[in-house]
Amino acid sequence: MIRQCVILVGGLGTRLGAATSTTPKPMLTVGDRPFLAWLTREVVRYGITDILLLTGHLAEVIRAGLEGLREWLPRAVTLTISEEPIRAGTGGALYHAREKLHDGFLLLNGDSLFDCDLSPLMTEEPGVLGRLMLRRLADASRYGVVEMSGDRVTAFQERPEPGSPGLINGGVYRLDRQVVDRTSAMCSLERDILPDLAWDGLLRGTESDGWFIDIGVPSDLYRAQREVPQRLTRPALLLDRDGVCNVDHGWVGTRERFEWVPGAQAAIRMAHARGWHVFIVTNQAGVARGLYHEADVLALHGWMRDEVLRSGGLIDDVRYCPFHPEAVVPAYRRNSSWRKPAPGMILDLLRAWRLDPNQCVLIGDRPTDMAAATAAGVTGLLFPGGNLADFVRPILDANQTEWPV
């Protein structure tokens, strides 16, 4: 599973004039934060733990802004910089960062945002060195266009005439580190590397109709001020785990005892496809009782997230409470504001992800879940059992005033 995201943040931004004379494009304010903070927040949803920024022009501004960027992230990740020694181009930036790259990594343009499902990029593919996310535009004249045969990228063409439709590179990639062997100290990924990969049959593409914006021109930077916060401030589905996501066999702490509730993965896929966050909030008193270890819970939740991601869904984040006031294990014997019916886990997610409580629904199977939802100020819905996808579908179809309490 891919854990590193590399972001190109060294462009000059000449089309934006004075706006980028002292500020790199990715650090321009969009809504209430730097544009780059929106990008990094999105990739963290997919389990990325290492973000590497490839800097050039005004690198000192990026470096000075690192702590501010970390404050916008919903959870801690490694956030580092690779600075090119000269103006090296997009391929050259990868070349100079080669010692810091994972075997497989995501690559993003730092001045565009493609709100698409990244799950096709999150696993490596044998015999393939890269996969691109592609967007079909009615007017592709600002960009080069991509030619395809099935899902194989066959060629890249120059910008078409104004008003011409085409399939464009959305600036979101998964690349194998072997691609860097084809780069040099000064080269362009788009002009020098990707066309050769396509010619050699090593490049694949996935088309998405997700929302796309490139802030490289003043009109789109202006449009981004309203549309980026509007589109990326998402509703959230919060799921209890035992009895909602998995069959409650009692004290499920390992994969061996884990069984998905019918429709659980489908429900998560549906919510993700509709643009919702999906979170897990679960009491795990089995740790306090000594039935399994906290490391077992973490491993199980990591496996759940990877399984869902492979199926095209996404669990954005997980909160669990291992404490119990009558714990057998002394280290876990205490009252906790995170243990439902207390709302601590939900409140922490609201804070970390900057969620609107009015746009959040918690689904649980016990009165303690409903009490926690009420205390946190979110809607709570009691799951009676059966197929979770059938239960979730009308919630996604309705707006918050119609949720079936």
Task: Describe these PLM feature segments.
Residues F105-L106, L113, S119-E125, L137-A140, ...:
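Catalytic-core segments of class I nucleotidyltransferases/pyrophosphorylases
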Residues M1-S21, Y46, L202, A236-D242:
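N-terminal nucleotide-binding beta1-loop-alpha1 segment
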Residues L54, A264, I268-M304, L314-A327, ...:
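Substrate-recognition element of Asp-dependent hydrolases with the DxDx(T/V) motif
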Residues M1-I7, R15, T29, R33-N109, ...:
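Conserved N-terminal catalytic core of the sugar/cofactor nucleotidyltransferase
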Residues R33-D50, A64, G263-G275, W303-S311:
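A short, N-terminal amphipathic alpha-helix
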Residues R131-V145:
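Short beta-strand-to-loop element that shapes/binds the nucleotide-sugar donor at the catalytic cleft/hinge
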Residues P235-F279:
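Active-site neighborhood of HAD-like aspartate-dependent phosphohydrolases
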Residues A295-L298, G302-D316, P325-L362, R366-V405:
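Asp-based, Mg2+/Mn2+-dependent phosphohydrolase catalytic module
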